[in-house]
């Protein structure tokens, strides 16, 4: 019995998007497939204490050895993908469909003289139209019941229909207007078929014309004082609007395409492929690859297509083009013809008519020609810009981004990998001591305004977020990046030097000194790092080293990590240190640098937004610093304050109606204030109805 804790993912690594998840056993077999509106909440629920889980769930999580997930664009997409995977893998713990029944569909038997609408499972018959699948039979029955208000097609069995024909009396649905009763001649078979066609068009996504027509009839009836008819048409419109759900996973019936997307950073790339056949997702594949050289995304896409479709070429001759060959003796060998037919079917199933990519390959024309030759017919390679295909491609891209994020998190969290990365970095930089603490600094601004800096801390290769710090940079230090870097490093390590002095006076070690300032930051700054990483090249490194020299700090080493080429710069060295692109040491440095950049960008955006808000508030007459502070304290954030209405601002102590309207106008414009705020009598300050 496996311990679920052995494969439990970190909660922050699980996306909050809707999606489908799979549990696999130790042999890699899928044992359970499920869907969720919020993957993080749903997947995390399986890792509660075992005694809190249901017996079936407890058995499943102790049998499993891994959990994976796929992000989709909506809950409806997750339903479709869940269905596909359950049919493909037949998981042992998905007992709802253990009888191998298909998910229920809404079928319209257009192959019959008098089409019938019904809920069906299993094999599909030629000539009929099918819509779905649905997760539950009751859901599609509710849908059909609502649709019969507008499209009263036959739903009875053949036996019931023939009995009604003989007796001349319709069934109950005919009496309550949920069937047009073609069995007794209330409507002709041709008119009934038109009703069935309308139902099929509605279910295929063409709902707006019917809703517009019913709305027009409702308005006309209301104008003629026929309120009973108007109410009936109103209910019809409501029924259609409730049942109409558009699905972007299931494309048109004729769609055969593969969707490729790549997410990458400087060192690695994640690839995701969705295979769509007959308008439905048949399969999904994903890879993580190391970028052993400096390649573009277009080159990565070219290599990817060559690898994926090269599998179809193995063991098969290129498809013949032009005139078909004549056999040696004037007749084709039956076995050979069957083999060629099978090969062609294999090619056309493996290589679809269309290949949709997130970025065009750098040899697009050659790739198209190669794929067309392999398939035996024209293949298009394109990047969709709009519509369902573009939406599905974005879903594939989101999966690639999530896969790369998860891979990096798992790689960073592995103890052996962390130890190797720290040792590699120590050896590459020639440092005497083990890297117990690393600090990284990044500067962020927009054209020299609202200049800020971030400090992130990694201890034993893991982020120590409680010791992250933010710096606001003003005055002469904000003139350029090197001056800003000098200022930040000097401010940070001047506290370290001061802490050492106090410790020496008290006769205690630095680690025993408690916080003694209002912000409680002295203790954090008391611990010096073994290594300081700055985001930048030689100028930034020189500025940081100059700050340490001015403070006479000699036990801290400084390096810079330059973007794009990922070069590591050491002070006073003419050439950079080049770490292998696949090394764990470079991966750690990149992760630390990216975290500092993220933290700096976040702080810069907050400061810029607050500055814009305070600037707008300064222009409001009668709004001084105390009331500005009260506003920010009440709403908790600048974002919430900007979204507040005048009525909500009235709840703040000391704000009257007139002042609340002025604040709302200053932050959201006159339209926002007038649309949400009540009218105010400026003479009395009273609210007007």
Curated annotation (Swiss-Prot):
Domain called GIY-YIG: residue spans: 16-95
Pfam families found in the cross-reference section: GIY-YIG (PF01541), HHH_5 (PF14520), UVR (PF02151), UvrC_RNaseH (PF22920), UvrC_RNaseH_dom (PF08459)
Domain of life: Bacteria
Keywords: Cytoplasm, DNA damage, DNA excision, DNA repair, Excision nuclease, SOS response
Compartment list: Cytoplasm
InterPro entries assigned: GIY-YIG_endonuc, GIY-YIG_endonuc_sf, GIY-YIG_UvrC_Cho, Hlx-hairpin-Hlx_DNA-bd_motif, RuvA_2-like, UVR_dom, UVR_dom_sf, UvrABC_protein_C
GO BP, sorted A to Z: nucleotide-excision repair; SOS response
GO molecular function: DNA binding; excinuclease ABC activity
Stretches the record annotates as Disordered: 316-337
Entry function: The UvrABC repair system catalyzes the recognition and processing of DNA lesions. UvrC both incises the 5' and 3' sides of the lesion. The N-terminal half is responsible for the 3' incision and the C-terminal half is responsible for the 5' incision.
Matching NCBIfam families: PRK00558.1-5 (NF001824)
Protein name: UvrABC system protein C
Provenance organism: Kocuria rhizophila (strain ATCC 9341 / DSM 348 / NBRC 103217 / DC2201)
This protein's encoding gene: uvrC
């Amino acid at each position: 019995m496996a311990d679920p804790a052995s494969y439990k993912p970190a909660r922050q690594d699980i996306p909050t998007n809707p999606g489908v998840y799979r549990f696999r056993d130790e042999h890699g077999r899928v044992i359970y497939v499920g869907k969720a509106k919020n993957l993080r909440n749903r997947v995390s629920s399986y890792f509660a204490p075992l005694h809190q889980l249901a017996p079936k769930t407890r058995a499943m999580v102790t049998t499993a050895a891994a959990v994976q997930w796929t992000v989709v664009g909506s809950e409806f997409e997750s339903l479709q993908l869940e269905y596909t995977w359950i049919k493909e893998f037949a998981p042992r713990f998905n007992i709802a469909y253990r009888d191998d029944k298909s998910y229920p569909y809404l079928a319209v038997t257009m192959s019959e003289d008098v089409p019938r609408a019904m809920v069906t499972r299993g094999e599909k018959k030629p000539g009929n139209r099918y819509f779905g699948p649905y997760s539950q039979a009751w859901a599609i029955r509710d849908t059909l019941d609502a649709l019969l208000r507008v499209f009263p097609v036959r739903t009875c069995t053949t036996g019931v229909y023939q009995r009604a024909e003989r007796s001349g009396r319709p069934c109950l649905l005919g009496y309550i207007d949920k069937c047009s009763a073609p069995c007794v001649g209330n409507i002709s078979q041709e008119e009934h078929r038109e009703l069935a066609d309308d139902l099929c068009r509605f279910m295929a996504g063409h709902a707006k014309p019917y809703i517009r027509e019913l709305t027009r009839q409702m308005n006309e009836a209301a104008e003629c004082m026929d309120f009973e008819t108007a109410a009936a048409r109103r209910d019809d419109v409501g029924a259609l609007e409730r049942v109409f759900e558009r699905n972007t996973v299931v494309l048109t019936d004729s769609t055969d395409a593969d969707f490729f997307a790549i997410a990458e950073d400087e060192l690695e790339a994640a690839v995701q492929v969705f295979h769509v056949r007959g308008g439905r997702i048949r399969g999904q594949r994903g890879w993580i690859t190391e970028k052993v050289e400096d390649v573009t995304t277009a080159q990565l896409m070219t290599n990817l297509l060559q690898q994926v479709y090269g599998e179809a070429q193995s063991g098969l001759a290129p498809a013949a083009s032009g005139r078909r060959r004549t056999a040696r003796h004037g007749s084709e060998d039956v076995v050979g013809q069957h083999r060629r037919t099978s090969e062609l079917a294999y090619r056309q199933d493996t290589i679809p008519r269309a290949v949709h990519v997130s970025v065009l390959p750098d040899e697009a024309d050659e790739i198209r020609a190669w794929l067309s030759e392999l398939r035996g017919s024209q293949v298009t390679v394109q990047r969709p810009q709009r519509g369902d295909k573009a939406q599905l491609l974005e879903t594939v891209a989101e999966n690639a981004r999530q896969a790369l994020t998860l891979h990096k998190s798992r790689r960073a969290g592995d103890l052996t990998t962390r130890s190797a990365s720290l040792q590699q970095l120590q050896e590459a930089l020639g440092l005497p001591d083990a890297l117990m603490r690393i600090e990284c600094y990044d500067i962020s601004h927009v054209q020299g305004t609202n200049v800020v800096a971030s400090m992130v801390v990694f201890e034993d290769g893991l982020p120590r977020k409680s010791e992250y710090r933010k710096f606001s940079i003003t005055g002469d230090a904000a003139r350029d990046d090197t001056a800003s870097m000098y200022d930040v490093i000097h401010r940070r390590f001047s506290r370290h030097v001061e802490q050492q002095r106090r410790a020496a006076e008290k006769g205690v070690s630095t680690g025993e000194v408690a916080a003694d300032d209002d912000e409680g930051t002295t203790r954090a700054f008391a611990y010096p790092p073994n290594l300081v990483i700055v985001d930048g090249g030689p100028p930034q490194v020189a500025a940081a080293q100059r700050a340490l020299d001015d403070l006479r700090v000699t036990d801290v080493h400084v390096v810079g990590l330059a973007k794009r080429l990922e070069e590591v710069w050491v002070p006073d060295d003419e050439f950079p240190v080049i770490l292998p692109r696949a090394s764990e040491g470079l991966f750690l440095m990149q992760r630390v640098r990216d975290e500092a950049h993220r933290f700096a960008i976040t702080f810069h955006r907050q400061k810029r937004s607050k500055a814009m808000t305070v600037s707008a508030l300064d222009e409001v007459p009668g709004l001084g610093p105390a009331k500005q502070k009260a506003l920010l304290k009440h709403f908790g954030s600048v974002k919430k304050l900007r979204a507040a209405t005048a009525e909500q601002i009235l709840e703040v102590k000391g704000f009257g109606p007139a002042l609340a309207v002025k604040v709302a106008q200053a932050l959201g414009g006159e339209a926002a204030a007038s649309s949400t705020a009540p009218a105010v009598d400026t003479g009395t300050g009273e609210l007007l109805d």
